[in-house]
């Protein structure tokens, strides 16, 4: 009986570790996607004569292409653009930023008043 419990606990640990690793990978890919979308929007809005209407149009096109997708509203796209523009010159982007959830990034971006304060929370 003891060995069975030990084996079961080992299996539970394997499953938990794999699930956690999968969630980390998904988060990493989402953050990279938000970064790329923000970069694209930042670059395009510099060259676009439409201003805010450009991002409104992009949000509608994304909603049409992916009905029901969440996070790609006008507000969400502006957040991605701000995310990119805030961190584009920082060296630690590719490693540290992908380890933090999107909701934590949004909290840091909205609450931190200085770059030093943002860096502090990111490197915790």
Which residues fall in each region the model found?
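Basic, low-complexity intrinsically disordered segments
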Residues: 1-124
């Amino acid at each position: 009986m003891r060995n069975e419990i030990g084996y079961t606990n080992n299996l539970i640990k394997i499953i938990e570790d794999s699930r956690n690793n999968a969630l980390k990978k998904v988060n990493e890919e989402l953050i990279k996607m938000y970064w790329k979308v923000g970069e694209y929007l930042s670059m395009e809005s510099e060259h676009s004569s439409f201003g805010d209407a450009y991002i409104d149009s992009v949000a509608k096109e994304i909603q049409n292409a992916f009905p029901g997708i969440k996070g790609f509203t006008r507000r969400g796209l502006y957040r991605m653009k701000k995310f990119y523009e805030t961190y584009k010159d920082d060296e630690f982007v590719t490693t540290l930023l992908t380890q933090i959830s999107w909701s934590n990034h949004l909290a840091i971006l909205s609450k931190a008043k200085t770059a030093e304060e943002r860096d502090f929370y990111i490197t915790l």
